[in-house]
């Protein structure tokens, strides 16, 4: 079931001495965070209006209404900013909101369980799907059509085609 709030950005470290912050957007268009109006914490207790934003290397430099000093900005480092899901357009064909994928069952092509989707990461070279198997370490796999050929949100599952180097791994048989 889709989350009713979607995280669209995270406040980072201060930028300068006048209250500006580094803002790490999670939207396809980084400046889209300006279009959603006030952004709130997940619990809705605090709200932030982005007054200005400009693109920097991998993030935005933003000013938030009421944040006027470096000390104010430092206190916000790490705060995640959310909007109501209803504010987002529906995803296009073949695109998904990360929040909709978290918690889905991961199965192989035969339907055998592999685990659950724990997270979607992007370390700069494309999306990575993290799967938590019933036991053992989590799997980090490329989120590509070859590895994840089927995403069925309505059925609550993703089909995973494990790459041969993972599928065939057997630590007990490893050469020493």
From Swiss-Prot:
It holds the Pfam family PRC_RimM. Belongs to the RimM family. This is Ribosome maturation factor RimM. The PRC barrel domain binds ribosomal protein uS19. GO terms for cellular component: cytoplasm; ribosome. GO terms for biological process: ribosomal small subunit biogenesis; rRNA processing. Binds ribosomal protein uS19. One of its GO terms (molecular function) is ribosome binding. Its main location: cytoplasm. InterPro entries: PRC_barrel-like_sf, PRC_RimM, RimM, RimM_N, RimM_N_sf, Transl_B-barrel_sf.
């Amino acid at each position: 079931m889709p989350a009713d709030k979607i995280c669209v950005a995270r406040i980072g470290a201060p930028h300068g001495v006048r209250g500006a912050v580094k803002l790490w957007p999670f939207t396809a268009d980084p400046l889209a965070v300006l279009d959603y109006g006030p952004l709130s914490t997940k619990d809705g207790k605090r709200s932030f209006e982005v007054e200005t934003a400009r693109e920097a290397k991998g993030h935005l430099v933003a000013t938030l209404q009421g944040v006027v000093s470096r000390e104010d900005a430092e206190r916000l480092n790490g705060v995640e900013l959310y909007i109501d899901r209803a504010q987002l357009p529906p995803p296009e064909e073949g695109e998904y909101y990360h929040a909709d994928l978290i918690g889905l069952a991961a199965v192989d092509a035969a339907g055998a369980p592999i685990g659950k989707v724990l997270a979607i990461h992007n370390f700069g070279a494309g999306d990575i799907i993290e799967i938590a198997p019933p036991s053992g370490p989590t799997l980090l796999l490329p989120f590509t059509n070859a590895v994840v050929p089927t995403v069925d949100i309505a059925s609550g599952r993703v089909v995973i085609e494990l790459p041969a180097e993972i599928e065939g791994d057997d630590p007990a048989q490893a050469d020493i």
